[in-house]
Amino acid sequence: GDLPIAFPAFMECVKMGMPIKHIRPTHVGRHPEVFAQAIAFTKAGGYIDITTSGGNYMGSAADAFVMALEEGAPIDRITFSSDGHGSMPRFDKNGEMIGLTVCKVSDNLKMLQELAGKIGLEKALLPLTRTIATALCLGNKGVIEAGKDADLLVMDKDLKPLHLFMKGRQVMKDSEVIVKGAFEE
């Protein structure tokens, strides 16, 4: 978030014995001082999360990711999340909150499309695949290997979803969801 005092508190926890891998700061792109501390946190071995649903002082989440890399953050210590379906404040031109909107999971895809144009698709996929799976200790996720969950998204040349498989089961075909959950129509 916006609290510059958060990272010193995190590092005190680490000094007292808490494994740095269990501390997961998010919304780290909202304030320049917080962002600088977040980059230092990655260099100490921690993970940071950049929110794709807006709120990054330097622009988009892709801009924040590139800036973090330029400042020396290890690429395998940065994850993305959308705060999918969480509430997000809306502000007027004077910075006054005027209401709420909803964060969209699709912001992750928009960020991937933007970031791929900046650093290439292979690197752009990392914060949404291998890095987040590793950070969350999800050993069967994040990579395509024998013996792992067969989660696979097939996209077209414009990085728009065509087919999706979850644990080997096709749930999207030709850009249409074919398997729905209990709360979907």
For the regions a language model picked out, list residue spans one by one:
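Short C-terminal domain-edge/linker segments immediately following a structured domain
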Residues: 54-58, 80-82, 109-114, 157, ...
